[in-house]
Amino acid sequence: MDPWEGWPYARAYLLLVAVAFLVVGGQVYLFHLRAAFRAKSMYGPVLLAPAIAVAGVVGAVTREGAIGWTVLVIFAIGLVEGLIGTVLHLRGIAARIGGFTVRNLTAGPPPLLPFAFGALGLTGALAVMWDAW
């Protein structure tokens, strides 16, 4: 990947994504703490969010060579983690008595938070690839 000149939109956006991952990661931590980390899979997004935030800052500074590809892979892992979390949360809501009722959607695992996590990973990856060709 080529070096970036100046501070184009994609670089500034990567910094915004890094901050967003810290905020969303904090919210994920609080929800999983409320659920007492019952499943080992709950540790994934909690540990991954700060790592992705660091990758976002590194990606905003440079995307040359292996660094750019590593940042891209880390954001892709965030996307996959978000998709897995969305499936797990929807399965958790469906398993509750009453299934997909408004009460279960509000009291159970948040159905949209993992999707937001994955969407941030996707937009971060797109920002890394911005003008790379």
Task: Spell out what each predicted region is.
Residues S41-P50, L72-F75, L105-G118:
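Alpha-helical transmembrane segments of polytopic membrane proteins
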Residues A60-W69, V87-G108:
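Membrane-helix boundary connector in multi-pass membrane proteins
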Residues M1-P8, W133:
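Short, strongly hydrophobic alpha-helical membrane anchors
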Residues Y9-L15, A66-L79:
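Interfacial segments of alpha-helical transmembrane regions
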Residues E5-Y13, Y29-A49:
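Transmembrane alpha-helix entry/boundary detector in multi-pass membrane proteins
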Residues V17-V28, A49-G59, F75-H89, G121-A125:
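Helical transmembrane-bundle signal
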Residues G99-W133:
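Alpha-helical membrane-associated segments of multi-pass integral membrane proteins
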Residues V28-R34, G59-T62, M129-W133:
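Juxtamembrane "helix-exit" motif on the non-cytosolic side of transmembrane helices
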